[in-house]
Amino acid sequence: MKSESAAIDIPESSSVAKGKAPLIAVSRNEKGGYRKGIAIFDFILRLAAIATALAAAAAMGTSDETLPFFTQFFQFQASYDDLPTFQFFVIAIAIVGGYLVLSLPFSIVAIVRPHAVGPRLLLIILDAVALTLNTAAGAAAAAIVYLAHNGNSNTNWLAICQQYGDFCQKVSGAVVASFITVVIFVFLIVLSAFALRRH
């Protein structure tokens, strides 16, 4: 018995011969995965920023200390609402925390649709505004905390942290937490810029 093999030659198309079709498909998958990974990391950073912003606002808003001694006319007490700077801090950081909570759905949209430019562009603009507000509140409060710890001999402002230790610890912790939120916002903006970058 003779075994004959029949071979059929099919000519390659021009796109297969040049290798364009497989390269385009691979690059799209890599870009989508890359942007989706950025979007997931963005969502995690937003959750961390919510925690630090709300912790800063809560720590500052509950900072209150009354000294155990008093006179007939005076009771020695320190509270965040004694200083307008600390009041601004609580309001500004609460606004930033509220914005971060409201930005979570847009971050989820960026995960589901990693190629969508609109939500990412909106987030980068609003993140920059929130970063500015957060930095202003943190810097203003940091100046007052510095005076509370060290005073100012030129103006005869005395340091109060020797007497109001718990108060100073709370407001210092609130300022540190607000600057951690600032650092997270910087990472969020850089991530959004990478996600919007076109190859």
Swiss-Prot record:
Coiled coil: none annotated. Pfam families: CASP_dom. GO terms for cellular component: Casparian strip; plasma membrane. GO terms for biological process: cell wall modification; cell-cell junction assembly. The chain crosses the membrane at residues 38-58, 88-108, 121-141, 174-194. Residues 1-37, 109-120, 195-199 are cytoplasmic. InterPro entries: CASP/CASPL (IPR006459), CASP_dom (IPR006702), CASPL (IPR044173). Residues 59-87, 142-173 are extracellular. Keywords: Cell membrane, Cell wall biogenesis/degradation, Membrane, Transmembrane, Transmembrane helix. It is a multi-pass membrane protein. Its main location: membrane. It comes from the Eukaryota. It is found in: Cell membrane. Belongs to the Casparian strip membrane proteins (CASP) family. Homodimer and heterodimers. NCBIfam families: A_tha_TIGR01569 (TIGR01569). Regulates membrane-cell wall junctions and localized cell wall deposition. Required for establishment of the Casparian strip membrane domain (CSD) and the subsequent formation of Casparian strips, a cell wall modification of the root endodermis that determines an apoplastic barrier between the intraorganismal apoplasm and the extraorganismal apoplasm and prevents lateral diffusion. This is Casparian strip membrane protein 1.
